[in-house]
């Protein structure tokens, strides 16, 4: 076998490999000998079929299998010997001229093919013991608890019909009938009757509720939306749809009195018990916000201390995912780049920078996890699936079946678990100090696109 490196340019490498016909023929013959004991051919006793006869019948298909296996084995050997870690799948280019292909399959000509790869760069990890990370912590006040209870009361408020001819406004509950289509064709789950939609609740597809503002009872509108790219149903994810929607009733919200009686409607003994419950719930939210702040600060530190050229193909892939999402969101909302005080070119440049950061951080976290033998167990993934199912009451079986039959979706659940375990590992080594902050500071809306 002859291996010639024809390109070595940064992270890109290409090789031309030539495998002698005799080597391929010997491997194919070995497969045919093994096949002799497995096939049944009329006129021959089991195991007594001559290899030459088998070659006439199965020669080409066995040689094709042999070539495929040889290419995979050879590529693996080449990459391993050079210490390459692949960023993407190898791109193999085979002979295409029919006469040459026939000779190779007949074992009469050497196999010459090329393979192009992009590799992961060598990464020198920083000393995490030198990292200083601030941990913002906020106290929960009585006012925070009262505000949370008010939000709960608003969510459980009753509604009363609006006057005849009144139009729907934000906060109103609109009862609708709708029929959804994609490219003019109805789809499963796209039809509903007597469905209550609270405008501004953000419980429906982005853009659906906003387009109900101003609708009157009996009025029909065509609502144009785009399903999120991470929508549970893969067949609908990222697709534009139209919903012919008719309002059959419009109701305005009524204020709810917060007292012991309100608490009892929620299954609690008193308002004091409700306050205890809300304080515990807020404690969880504050803890999660602190975690996100610490994680963001740590990722920023990793970004600062690990500057290297990431594989272009991985950056392109990450950029395309984000850009497709941006375009779908803009199409759904009807916004333009001018509305965001930018241009398409500037936006692309910004998102490509974010894509580069994400890819580099992903490679760094992977390197840390690999070197420190950090893994995600099947039990941890199962617990994540269960939590996801619990978050969608009434659809638990659908969620469970979706992940059980979709390895890619399961991998998407595994990735953040792995990332969090690596982050925890680094935080154990870093110098983490608490800092008291206000609730507003803890929950301030930072631009998190790059995280």
Swiss-Prot record:
Q: Where in the cell is it found?
A: Cytoplasm
Enumerate the InterPro entries for this protein. PPIase_dom_sf, PPIase_FKBP_dom, Trig_fac, Trigger_fac_C, Trigger_fac_C_sf, Trigger_fac_ribosome-bd_bac, Trigger_fac_ribosome-bd_sf, Trigger_fact/SurA_dom_sf
Catalysed reaction(s) here are: [protein]-peptidylproline (omega=180) = [protein]-peptidylproline (omega=0)
Q: What is its EC number?
A: 5.2.1.8
EC supergroup of this enzyme = isomerase
Function noted in UniProt:
Involved in protein export. Acts as a chaperone by maintaining the newly synthesized protein in an open conformation. Functions as a peptidyl-prolyl cis-trans isomerase.
Q: What is this protein called?
A: Trigger factor
Instruction: Please tell me the species this chain comes from.
Output: Bradyrhizobium sp. (strain ORS 278)
Q: What is the lineage of its organism?
A: Bacteria, Pseudomonadati, Pseudomonadota, Alphaproteobacteria, Hyphomicrobiales
């Amino acid at each position: 076998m002859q291996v010639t490196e024809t390109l070595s340019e940064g992270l890109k490498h290409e090789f031309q490999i030539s495998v002698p016909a005799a080597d391929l023929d010997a491997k194919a013959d070995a497969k045919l000998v093994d096949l002799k004991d497995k096939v049944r051919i009329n006129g021959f006793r089991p195991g007594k079929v001559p290899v030459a006869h088998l070659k006439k019948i199965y020669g080409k298909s066995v040689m094709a299998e042999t070539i495929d296996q040889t290419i995979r084995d050879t590529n693996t050997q080449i990459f391993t010997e050079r210490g390459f870690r692949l960023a993407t799948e190898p791109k193999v280019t085979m002979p295409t001229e029919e006469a040459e292909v026939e000779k190779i399959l007949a074992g009469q000509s050497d196999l010459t093919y090329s393979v192009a790869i992009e590799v992961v760069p060598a990464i020198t990890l920083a000393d995490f013991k030198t990292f200083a990370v601030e941990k913002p912590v906020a106290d929960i006040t009585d006012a925070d608890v009262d505000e949370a209870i008010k939000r709960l009361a608003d969510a459980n408020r009753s509604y009363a019909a609006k006057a005849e001819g009144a139009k729907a406004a934000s906060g109103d509950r609109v009862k609708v009938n709708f029929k959804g289509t994609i490219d003019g064709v109805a789809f499963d789950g796209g039809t509903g009757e007597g469905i209550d939609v609270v405008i501004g609740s953000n419980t429906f597809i982005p853009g659906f509720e906003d387009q109900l503002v101003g609708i009157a009872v009996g009025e029909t509108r065509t609502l144009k939306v785009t399903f999120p790219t991470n929508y549970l149903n893969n067949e609908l994810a990222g697709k534009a749809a139209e919903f012919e929607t008719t309002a059959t009733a419009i109701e305005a919200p009524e204020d709810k009195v917060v007292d012991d009686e309100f608490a009892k409607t929620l299954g609690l003994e008193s308002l004091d018990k409700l306050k205890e419950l809300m304080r515990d719930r807020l404690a969880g939210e504050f803890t999660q916000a602190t975690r996100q702040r610490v994680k963001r600060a740590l990722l920023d530190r990793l970004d600062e201390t690990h500057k290297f050229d990431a594989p272009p193909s991985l950056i392109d892939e990450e950029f395309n995912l984000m850009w497709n999402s941006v375009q779908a969101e803009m199409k759904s909302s009807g916004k333009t780049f001018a509305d965001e005080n930018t241009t398409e070119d500037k936006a692309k440049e910004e998102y490509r920078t974010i894509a580069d950061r994400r890819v580099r951080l992903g490679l760094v976290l992977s390197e840390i996890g690999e070197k420190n033998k950090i893994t995600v167990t099947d039990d941890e993934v199962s617990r994540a699936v269960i939590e996801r199912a619990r978050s969608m009451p009434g659809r638990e079986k659908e969620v469970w079946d979706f992940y059980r039959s979709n390895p890619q979706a399961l991998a998407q659940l595994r990735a953040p678990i792995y990332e969090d375990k690596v982050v925890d590992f680094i935080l154990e080594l870093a110098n983490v100090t608490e800092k008291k902050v206000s609730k507003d500071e803890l929950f301030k809306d930072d631009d998190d696109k790059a995280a």
